[in-house]
């Protein structure tokens, strides 16, 4: 008799500092623009103010987009939900996952975050990046266990040439 494994779904959302990491250059540029536009008798201060305001709207949209991102790891699938005005949901079957990678940019190292990349045999989503994961989370081990159980449940065995 085959043993049945039931795990609760894991929901992962990017850490809010990932927004600062991704958009630091635009945050600085917008701040400098507003400061410059506030200077009396500055050349083109109205234009700089309008551009800074538009950049602020763009940053607000990107912040909402990042906050609405959600990764769900279930027993059978890895689900990625994203979008603001146009919502999309990408599904990846766990038994198709073939490899993992953890990486950190310099800024992610400063804020103790990482990006976990998941590679699969899926045609539409061969690589899925889970961004803004806290360093203390051992996500790869958790996903690897679920992948192995999913493959065992479906009697899928990997054959390698060595």
Outline where the language-model segments fall.
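N-terminal basic, Ser/Thr-rich segments that initiate or prime the first beta/alpha elements at protein or domain
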Residues: 1-162
């Amino acid at each position: 008799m085959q043993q049945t494994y039931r795990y609760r779904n894991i929901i992962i959302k990017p850490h809010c500092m990932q927004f600062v990491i991704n958009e630091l250059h635009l945050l600085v540029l917008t701040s400098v623009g507003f400061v410059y536009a506030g200077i009396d008798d500055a050349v083109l201060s109205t234009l700089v103010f309008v551009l800074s305001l538009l950049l602020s709207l763009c940053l607000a949209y990107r912040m909402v987009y990042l906050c609405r991102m959600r990764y769900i790891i279930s027993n059978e699938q890895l689900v990625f939900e994203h979008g603001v005005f146009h919502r999309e949901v990408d599904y990846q079957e766990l038994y198709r996952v073939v490899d993992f990678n953890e990486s950190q940019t310099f800024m992610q190292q400063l804020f103790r975050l990482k990006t976990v990349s998941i590679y699969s045999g899926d045609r539409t989503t061969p690589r899925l990046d889970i961004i803004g994961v806290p360093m203390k989370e051992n996500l790869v081990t958790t996903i690897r266990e679920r992948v192995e159980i999913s493959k065992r449940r479906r009697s899928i065995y990997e054959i390698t040439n060595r």
